[in-house]
Amino acid sequence: MRTRTAAGRFACGWLVLLLAACSAPPASALLLGSTLWTYQGASSVFTAAWSPGGKYLALGEADGTVQVRDAVTGKLTFSMYGHTGAVWALAWSPDGKRIASASWDGTVRVWDMATGRQLLTYRGHTGEVLAVAWSPDSRHIASAGSDGTVQVWDAATDQHILTYRGHTNTVAALAWSPDGTRLASASFDHTVQVWDASTGEHAFTYRGHTSYVWTLAWSPDGTRIASGSTDGTVQVWDAATGKRLVTYRGHTNGVQAVAWSPDGTRIASASWDTTVQVWKATSGRQVFTYRGHSSIVGALAWSPNGERIASVADDVRVWQAS
């Protein structure tokens, strides 16, 4: 499967004997929704993930390659090879030194970002691996997939720690709470389940969707979860109680990816209707619709500084988000 509005005027000026002149960038480069760069390779891209510092954008491809590109220019930095199936999900370690890749080949691989060398291969799943997430303290990785399980394992040794079996169908997405104490998992069984990350003890099940739940994201402050579904909605709900707070119905087809802005005020959602929509997290009021793609948008990622969004369809596009 698969802009920054100018904060202030660009000033040109001079400093006697030291600075002669400067020229402003095109105004269009600073407009909300302006496309900064695009990428379309020989192999389809399925996922994108920003490095914690925002310097790099990692891409997972159908041919099993993981690419790391300069986030400003789109220029290829290096590629990593090892998977024998499509790379469906990526997660950077919080310190940006490693990246985990989840693949249809049934493995999760951990790579060194300084050298591109493969460090670990986790083989605990019995089917395609569709989701991977790094714990906030960098010690653990959680992965999930078509076998219906979520597995937590040691990020340094690949030693298995626990398996969560609360779902009855494919687990398509997962996320750690910002404090690292809980995990949320989204499934084709139409539910999102929240559970204790250290014991696997179930906390509660959210049943607001009427079809496959493809995606979820925890708010930066840990109080809310947003989940997107084939039912075409994004639902925002209280992460402690499961109470629904907002239902967003702006899309005309299934929603496959959601992401919170770093300040927690907005949510971006990517849909099979070929759009990415940005809207207020508290009210559901639409702020902007990005229409740069011509096919299903299957993945998106918000840059750490909140200024840009990377979205993935038949092509990858990086565009101004504020």
Predicted regions and their residues:
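N-terminal secretory signal peptides that target proteins for export/translocation
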Residues: 1-7
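Bacterial N-terminal signal peptides
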Residues: 11-21
